[in-house]
Amino acid sequence: KTYDFWNEKCIIEFKKRTCNHDTFPDFILQKDKYDMNMELAKKHKISFYYQNKFANGKIWEWDITDMVERNDLPRLINKEMNRYTYVDNPNKIVKQVYMLRLDQGYEI
C-alpha cells in the first residue's frame, strides 16, 4: 500500500516530520510513491495529495494532481538516502525524488 488515506475524492500520502515546517527549503516525495499513487488517482479519477505534519503542529499539503496538470512538479533528482526511513540501518541507496517547496503547497 503506497497511500495512507483513500476515499471517493482523493488519495493522501501522509508524513509526520520531526522538524518544523520552515526548517528546510523543500521536502521529499519519492518517485515510486508518486508513480503508484498517481496511477491509482488517474484510474479512479480522483486527486492525489501529499501531506506533511510538522513538529510545530503545522500541516502542509501539496495537490500533486494539480501540480502535474499545471506542469509545476519539480524536476526529478537522484538523492542518496537511507534504504528505510525508520530502521536503524546505515545503508544508503540512491532514490529518485521530487523536492517540493513550501510555496508549491499550502497550510491546512
Feature locations, PLM:
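Short, conserved, surface-exposed binding loops centered on an aromatic residue
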Residues: D4-W6, L40-K42
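Structural beta-sheet core signal
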Residues: I11, Y50-N52
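A generic structural signal for alpha->beta connector loops
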Residues: E8, K45-S47
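Non-catalytic C-terminal interaction segments of nucleic acid-processing enzymes
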Residues: M38, I46, K53-I108
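Beta-rich catalytic cores
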Residues: K1
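General helical secondary-structure elements
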Residues: I11-E13, L29, K79, V97
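Mg2+/Mn2+-dependent nuclease catalytic core
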Residues: R17-A41
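Conserved catalytic cores of phosphodiester-cleaving nucleases, focusing on short active-site segments
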Residues: F5-H21
